A protein has these predicted regions:
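Amphipathic alpha-helical "stem/stalk" segments
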Residues: 31-138
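Membrane-embedded hydrophobic alpha-helical segments
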Residues: 1-29
C-alpha cells in the first residue's frame, strides 16, 4: 500500500467534508440574519405600540399637543426606528400582504394622529395586526 496515496485521499475527503460544512454554515448564517431582521421589525412595532397606549386617544386640542410634545417627538423617533427595521428586512416581508398593508397604514396614519385628526386606536389596531401575525419563523 502506498501511504502517500492513502494520505492524499484522506486529505481530499477531509477537505470536501470541510467545504460542505462551510456551505451549510453560510446558509444557516443567512437564515439567522433574516430571522434577526424580522424580529427587529416586530420589536420596533411593539415599542411603538407601547408608547401609543400611554398617550391620549386623540390630540384634538392644542393644550394636549403641547403637554405631550416630548412624547410626540419620541413616538416619531420610534416610528423612525420601525422604518429603519423595515428597511433592514430588505423585502423579506413583502409576501405577507397583511404586514405590508398594516405597515403602510401606520405610515399613513401617524402624522394625522399627532395632528389630532385621527385616534390612537387606529394605530393600535394596525400594530396588533402586525404583532399577531407569525412571520418571524416562517
Amino acid at each position: 500500500m502506498d501511504w502517500a496515496t492513502f494520505w492524499s485521499a484522506a486529505s481530499a475527503i477531509a477537505t470536501t467534508a470541510a467545504a460542505f460544512v462551510a456551505v451549510w454554515a453560510i446558509f444557516r448564517w443567512k437564515k439567522q440574519d433574516e430571522l434577526k431582521a424580522k424580529m427587529a421589525f416586530k420589536l420596533a412595532i411593539a415599542d411603538y405600540k407601547y408608547l401609543i397606549l400611554q398617550l391620549p386617544d386623540q390630540f384634538d386640542k392644542e393644550e394636549l399637543r403641547n403637554k405631550y410634545s416630548n412624547e410626540r417627538k419620541k413616538l416619531t423617533d420610534l416610528l423612525s426606528a420601525c422604518n429603519h427595521a423595515w428597511l433592514v428586512t430588505e423585502d423579506l416581508l413583502l409576501s405577507h400582504d397583511l404586514i405590508v398593508s398594516n405597515w403602510s397604514n401606520i405610515l399613513d396614519t401617524h402624522a394625522h394622529y399627532l395632528q389630532g385628526s385621527r385616534q390612537s386606536e387606529e394605530l393600535v389596531i394596525f400594530c396588533n395586526a402586525i404583532l399577531s401575525k407569525k412571520f418571524i419563523f416562517s
